[in-house]
């Protein structure tokens, strides 16, 4: 069939377009008769849905569309205490938070600039999962996922800077600088730039 005759058929409203689809007609009568004869020959037993269906209806599928989240079904909460020595260990803290575990970071073993970087990194990950963060002590921080509620009853006492008098003659000023505890970025702005 040529293109012009097809266009004429479309314009004229011919639904079958000169029997182009007749070639695709299935010969179902012969197949149905053969299947019907084989069923009667085998004693007329009924086929089960799994025998006649090409798809596995059961196959271990329980019919539930619920996808489990790690840590949600467990009854006990888990707290990870981490004492990292380098920034390279911080992705483990983020992974623990993603698994809905609380993380306590003790950063006393790290250099102050690396500790500040680590606190900011984990604080960003905690913010991304809508978690909570709290400074527990000097260079010790608590990071919790959103499923954990963190409350601090002595927030005023914990956030107020404590003044410790030191004898400046006995301790060189350079060692005071390196032993300084990191202050997270979210507390530096609220505490007046400690």
Curated annotation (Swiss-Prot):
GO biological process: division septum assembly; FtsZ-dependent cytokinesis
Disulfide bonds: none
Sequence segments annotated as region (Disordered): 35-54, 159-194
Gene Ontology cellular-component annotations: cytoplasm
InterPro entries tied to this protein: Cell_div_SepF (IPR023052), Cell_div_SepF/SepF-rel (IPR007561), SepF-like_sf (IPR038594)
Localization (cell): Cytoplasm
Ranges that cross the membrane: none
Main location: cytoplasm
Keywords annotated in UniProt: Cell cycle, Cell division, Cytoplasm, Septation
Keyword Cell division assigned: yes
Keyword Cell division in record: yes
Recorded superkingdom: Bacteria
Role description: Cell division protein that is part of the divisome complex and is recruited early to the Z-ring. Probably stimulates Z-ring formation, perhaps through the cross-linking of FtsZ protofilaments. Its function overlaps with FtsA.
UniProt similarity note: Belongs to the SepF family.
PANTHER family: CELL DIVISION PROTEIN SEPF (PTHR35798:SF1)
Self-association and partners: Homodimer. Interacts with FtsZ.
The name this protein goes by in its record: Cell division protein SepF
Organism: Prochlorococcus marinus (strain MIT 9313)
Gene: sepF
